[in-house]
């Protein structure tokens, strides 16, 4: 929007409407935007939801995913104020690059359609955010009573229901 050019950034302004079914991490504001619409779990009524599904969906695929974007191949380049600054130590950068390269190679091997491979480098940020989201969501879910009780619902274990929610 050209009328904003040269003016101070309004850090309270969202780029999407509250009812939007999406979430995002904005590195230049160092913020995660989670509109109300994103908390509707597709295919479920609220009374049908259990912690496993909610943590798999909301914790992993949404909140954890967006948090992890702050530390992926792009988000890590911004400091806590949203400035484009190198703030990691050389050792941290080297360790990150080593692990990221493994993920790039792993995704390069995926062939979802015969003859077509995923570009692991191009999808790195999303792949890191997906993995980080899953791991953060699991850590949060492990603190719930449902996880501790470990009782099946509809013949599915709590962890199976967690991944059903993620899917």
Label for each model-derived stretch:
Residues 1-61, 66, 70-167:
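Intrinsically disordered, low-complexity linker/terminal regions across diverse proteins
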């Amino acid at each position: 929007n050209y009328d904003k050019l040269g003016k101070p950034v309004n850090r309270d302004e969202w780029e999407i409407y509250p009812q939007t079914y999406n979430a995002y991490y904005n590195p230049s504001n160092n913020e995660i935007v989670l509109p109300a619409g994103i908390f509707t779990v597709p295919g479920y009524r609220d009374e049908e939801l259990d912690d496993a599904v909610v943590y798999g969906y909301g914790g992993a695929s949404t909140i954890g995913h967006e948090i992890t974007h702050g530390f992926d191949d792009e988000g890590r380049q911004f400091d806590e104020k949203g400035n484009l600054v190198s703030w990691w130590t050389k050792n941290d950068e080297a360790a990150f690059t080593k692990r990221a390269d493994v993920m790039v190679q792993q995704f390069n091997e995926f062939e979802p359609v015969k003859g077509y491979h995923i570009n692991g480098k191009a999808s790195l940020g999303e792949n890191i955010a997906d993995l980080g989201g899953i791991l953060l969501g699991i850590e949060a879910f492990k603190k719930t009573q449902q996880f501790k009780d470990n009782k099946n619902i509809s013949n599915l274990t709590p962890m199976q229901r967690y991944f059903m929610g993620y899917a």
